[in-house]
Amino acid sequence: MDSEKILNPRLVSINSTSRKGMSVELPQKPPPPPSLLDRFKALLNQREDEFGGGEEVLPPSMDEIVQLYEVVLGELTFNSKPIITDLTIIAGEQREHGEGIANAICTRILEAPVEQKLPSLYLLDSIVKNIGRDYGRYFSSRLPEVFCLAYRQAHPSLHPSMRHLFGTWSSVFPPPVLRKIDMQLQLSSAANQSSVGASEPSQPTRGIHVNPKYLRRLEPSAAENNLRGINSSARVYGQNSLGGYNDFEDQLESPSSLSSTPDGFTRRSNDGANPSNQAFNYGMGRATSRDDEHMEWRRKENLGQGNDHERPRALIDAYGVDTSKHVTINKPIRDMNGMHSKMVTPWQNTEEEEFDWEDMSPTLDRSRAGEFLRSSVPALGSVRARPRVGNTSDFHLDSDIKNGVSHQLRENWSLSQNYPHTSNRVDTRAGKDLKVLASSVGLVSSNSEFGAPPFDSIQDVNSRFGRALPDGTWPHLSARGPNSLPVPSAHLHHLANPGNAMSNRLQGKPLYRPENQVSQSHLNDMTQQNQMLVNYLPSSSAMAPRPMQSLLTHVSHGYPPHGSTIRPSLSIQGGEAMHPLSSGVLSQIGASNQPPGGAFSGLIGSLMAQGLISLNNQPAGQGPLGLEFDADMLKIRNESAISALYGDLPRQCTTCGLRFKCQEEHSKHMDWHVTKNRMSKNHKQNPSRKWFVSASMWLSGAEALGAEAVPGFLPTEPTTEKKDDEDMAVPADEDQTSCALCGEPFEDFYSDETEEWMYKGAVYMNAPEESTTDMDKSQLGPIVHAKCRPESNGGDMEEGSQRKKMRS
């Protein structure tokens, strides 16, 4: 009986050698359910046992393999990454029976329910991209029929995912097959319509974290990829394919399993590869081959601006994601900041990530996912070099996004000091040009405020500004990181038209309050420097003019102008003078190789593309009215004030006259009125005093003596108010629903004042005259109608009874 006892599970961890004398056997933990790969092997072993008996067992035929594969294929009833992984491995091991397996998968897609078609298509996609070879030819014969039927039967919410899946097949299936599908389903036109209709890109689906012990990264080095390049890529039907996915049989080495069990499934490797990288990693993270990056540059030149043609392994991350809840909206490919597509490279998918880089930067979210400008990497925040274990020739950057503008700028400055070999490229990073432009307008108060290098170093950095910019274009604003300084459109208006009146205005009125005085010479220098910068702007600017003194006036009063966005960290604090752009830096910019007009044209064009500048002519806003009283100023009609008080608040309360801007605020206000009116109606208030007093009362009141500051005009004898029985109420009691005297039920109602249910016209029988708040319920007696209470209980009914009215 001792062997049948159930012990505490904590004892399982005790070493068995420490309990030799114990006769109790600990219960064993049930083994996990076998995977599909193990089940398939078990079915093969069962077949061998059935045909055993000492004779040589013949290898299974194609029909038998297909029959066993259909058994495990029936488990793919939902979008599961482990199931797709095992089915892909089985298909890779049984490549000699690939034609039958492909037909079984196509039949499964045609006959499966609607909700199970997309997981089967993902299985087809995984087999073609990871194994390739003959499977592409087997599936091509039935792909138009299978995909078109599944697309027509699928729910409309799954159509974007299926179009995205179709867009990744440009390198694994023949073009005639894809054109046939496109003609039948009109996928190109549907993708363009969805791209135009989507104002904002949808939130990208998150990848599924995989335990690193299941990952073996066998990524070839960059030098080896350059050598085999196109030779290993040209595989499928005379068109260039991505190397490393269709040459599955050419680079077989030691077998390994994704589930860490020896299953015989081979994996591609390379002698000089780093063990921390992987090439065959379908659906298990975000690793891609270097061939993807190489082919991505070339394919973007030929495939236009649609989202229908993506790299073959771009959809691997979708396996195991519920596409009915996460629908990807196809969006047009926009090269980052208008720069050439060869300058961008999909780098973020080369390592396993537990978050999406698109979530961290709005610029990345608006641009092509998986692409990034190399020149803007150091501006993303804290960037530190991480040495690699194997091949150390490649320099990888591990970027961690930090919060706060000042902290990011300090990290960038420390990077330029710690890594001298990258400091030559820092001067062209996005954000430096914006800092130069912003400082000329007066947005940056001091460099030490953000932990930036001294202003002399900025001049040294910008001395190479002209020759560092490629093709004579100014770095675009969308290439900046989170630490760059935005330039609002209102400030560009000030730069475009400073006006001649600014000098006169500066001579007449100070820029700051008296406690924050700035020297007149400093203001004049800043005016001259701003005028020098305006000379570089194109004369044919279509922006609406806005005077410079408008910005200066708003700053002098301590608030930003309407329509402009000035960060709080960039505001002028405690009398710190604005640091204008020195004339030396302007001369260095003017002496650069690039044409000045083209540089600022590119900057303005980028601002217009990002929506920061509009071509619509905006009316010039009026200046502040000031704080000094002037009778003549009151006679002038101020349209801005009238609009702010009336025009901008179209909704008005008919009861009290208050105005509101939106319907929600107006509705809340009306609800408040209804509550107040209901409370006033239920609670009858007495007047504070009588209207008039007689002459005798007036005279007697004037001669009255006492400590009161004002004589009392009302009679001194107390007057008892006549109260109605209907005004009395007590809280409802579930234990007593009828009068204790007459037996009739009480009339209950909900009181808005007390926010509880009350009995109307009811009182406590034994309630005293004083307050009953601290008294026990048993002392008050039963609840009775006020009209039923006997008058003999304590004298007169109105005087001797405590009538509980509705509490306010």
UniProtKB/Swiss-Prot annotation:
The record, for SUPFAM superfamilies, names: ENTH/VHS domain
Q: Give one GO biological process term.
A: termination of RNA polymerase II transcription
Transmembrane portions of the chain: none
Q: What is its main location?
A: nucleus
Q: Which keywords accompany this UniProt record?
A: Cytoplasm, Flowering, Metal-binding, mRNA processing, Nucleus, Zinc, Zinc-finger
Q: Which CDD domains match?
A: CID_Pcf11 (cd16982)
Task: List localization entries.
Answer: Nucleus; Cytoplasm
* Disulfide bonding pattern of the chain: none
Positions with biased composition (Polar residues): 196-205, 253-263, 271-280
Q: Where is this region: Disordered?
A: 1-32, 192-212, 246-293, 785-808
Q: Care to name a GO molecular-function term for this sequence?
A: mRNA binding
Transmembrane helix in keyword set: no
Q: Which SMART domains match?
A: RPR (SM00582)
Residues forming the CID domain are 61-189
Entry comment describing in which tissues the protein is expressed: Expressed in embryos, seedlings, roots, leaves and flowers.
Q: What happens when the gene is disrupted?
A: Delayed flowering mediated by FLC under both long-day and short-day conditions, but normal response to vernalization treatment. Abnormal alternative polyadenylation-dependent FCA expression profile of the known transcripts. Global differentially processed (DPG) and differentially expressed (DEG) stress-associated genes due to alternative polyadenylation, splicing or transcription initiation.
Where does each C2H2-type zinc finger lie? Answer: 651-673
| A GO cellular-component term linked to this record | cytoplasm
This protein's assembly is summarised as: Homodimer. Forms a complex with cleavage and polyadenylation specificity factor (CPSF) subunits CPSF30, CLPS3 and PCFS1.
Q: What is this protein for, i.e. what is its function?
A: Promotes flowering by suppressing FLC-mediated inhibition of flowering through the regulation of FCA pre-mRNA alternative processing. Regulates mRNA maturation including alternative polyadenylation, splicing or transcription initiation of stress-associated genes.
Name under which the protein is recorded: Polyadenylation and cleavage factor homolog 4
| Organism from which the protein derives | Arabidopsis thaliana
Its taxonomic placement starts with: Eukaryota, Viridiplantae, Streptophyta, Embryophyta, Tracheophyta
Protein's gene = PCFS4
